[in-house]
Amino acid sequence: GLEEGVVTPGTHYPCSMGYHFGRNKLGCHAHKSPVDFEESIMMSCNAYYCYILRDLLENKKYSTIGVAMDRWQEYVKSFGFGQKLGSDFPSELGGFIPGSGYYNKVYGKGGWKATTVISLSIGQGEIGTTPLHMANLCATIANRGFYYIPHIIKDSENVRIEEKYKERHYTMVDTTHFPKVIGGMYRAVNSGFGSGGTASIAAVKGLDICGKTGTAQNPHGSDHSVFICFAPKDNPKIAVAAYVENGGFGATYAAPIASLLTEMYLNKEISEDRKYLEERMMNSNLMDRVKVRRR
């Protein structure tokens, strides 16, 4: 949205528990309204991203919604989505990012519009991705617009690291736009409880963790808890994606787990004031939320 000029850091959009279109609604949680760009990330406002996708797909600079849709697809794929990243992880999956061809096949050419695909704006709908893709997205944001192909071995005296793992892969989004995204992620974690930030539970003193919560809808049971983060804010050393099946809101399980991993990696220990959180995560059991299909 920033790259296309359909939104600026100062653009405000309203949110009344979601994005309303016709008799339908893509839901959101209660928070202040309206919100600007950074606040939308800080407060995890679904409606904000619905407005951005709508304005992108209905942008008059594109001759048809199909052309705009394919432009959106190009942007998303430039972050590594919808394809195998080429890592040395076993059984890597490529995922799926839909374009106009997909929707023309499903609905017929001219048979769909922005509201038909509005759930794409929050990473749902027909989007298929993996935790590796999400961790790579987080690393890309931390790097202000580029990523390295993920691989298992960071360094070794006896193993030569292939050159492809040292090459930078740049996105289609200019590096000047990433500080505002990072600002929102920083505020999501470090604004303090009661501020509206959805990831205050992930704050660790001195680490400047930047993160974004997510809740993946699950038609077969409790929603999945999702969180991505990197740290520190400047000169980052680690990026994490946590996905907890049936965990509910991102701040409930994924954010605590990811922040504990980040803290241990950077500090080599868990601080005393967060030991309770470590114990709670280690002793949690979500098996009662899993629906078993009987044959």
Residue ranges and their predicted role:
Residues G1-G247, R289-R295:
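Beta-lactam-recognizing serine transpeptidase/beta-lactamase-like catalytic domain environment
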Residues G248-T252:
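Ordered, soluble secondary-structure elements with a strong preference for glycine-centered loop motifs
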Residues R160-K164, R168-H169, I257-R295:
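Short, gly/Ser/Thr-rich active-site loops of penicillin-recognizing serine hydrolases
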Residues T130-N136, Y253-L261:
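Short amphipathic alpha-helical face segments that pack within enzyme cores
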